[in-house]
Amino acid sequence: MIAFIVLLSLAAVLQQSSGTVDFASESSNKKDYQREIVDKHNALRRSVKPTARNMLQMKWNSHAAQNAKRSADRCTFAHSPEHTRTVGKFRCGENIFMSSQPFAWSGVVQAWYDEIKNFVYGIGAKPPGSVIGHYTQIVWYKSHLLGCASAKCSSTKYLYVCQYCPAGNIRSSIATPYKSGPSCGDCPSACVNGLCTNPCEYEDAYTNCNDLVKERKCQTEWIKSQCPATCFCHNKII
């Protein structure tokens, strides 16, 4: 039987005759498969070209996984409402994959990553208009909390969802999802196998917080509340 797979926002339907597995055996509730999903993401993040000087190591997050499960259980090939994709202070991004047969999680993640063929670092989508958002979310440097889940919607419809916190794919930075340079160049004292392990626990509300803090310092409650990462996360990846 030929399986079809679809990635959200991808207009074409892709066909594949191998890679299918028993759905129950691939449950993301199992610790082994959580480890497989995290390890697959980290291996891909570690292997980016050009190399990344600020790429954070991903870790499994149960709250993100619960949110992903609720999203998958809707059995709707559409992103879940943004307000339902939060973990603590972080807003979370989301990748969705649909297939007519069950797939191994490593194959799902690889399918998202394979959009790299239409991505050029520093330029973005090439040719222009190509879908690259699943790839860029996987390699977004500061997305370090990961949770995934799947749902069997029918005998011919399987939905896979991963959520990433904090969210990536900031439009103004989509061509540079990480800072190029020597691996762990921005975290020499907090590095494990080429990935940084010093994430900031805060998230700035504005992309120009560096400029705001330079101008006004972190002396007002407004600045501290709107730019907490810039104000408080020294020597961390923000």
Curated annotation (Swiss-Prot):
This is Cysteine-rich venom protein 2. It is found in: Secreted. Blocks contraction of smooth muscle elicited by high potassium-induced depolarization, but does not block caffeine-stimulated contraction. May target voltage-gated calcium channels (Cav) on smooth muscle. Residues 38-164 form the SCP domain. Disulfide bonds join 75-153, 92-165, 148-162, 184-191, 187-196, 200-233, 209-227, 218-231. Residues 200-233 form the ShKT domain. It holds the Pfam family CAP. Keywords: Calcium channel impairing toxin, Disulfide bond, Ion channel impairing toxin, Neurotoxin, Secreted, Signal, Toxin, Voltage-gated calcium channel impairing toxin. It comes from the Eukaryota. It comes from Hydrophis hardwickii. GO terms for molecular function: calcium channel regulator activity; toxin activity. Residues 1-19 form the signal peptide. Its main location: secreted. Belongs to the CRISP family. GO terms for cellular component: extracellular region.
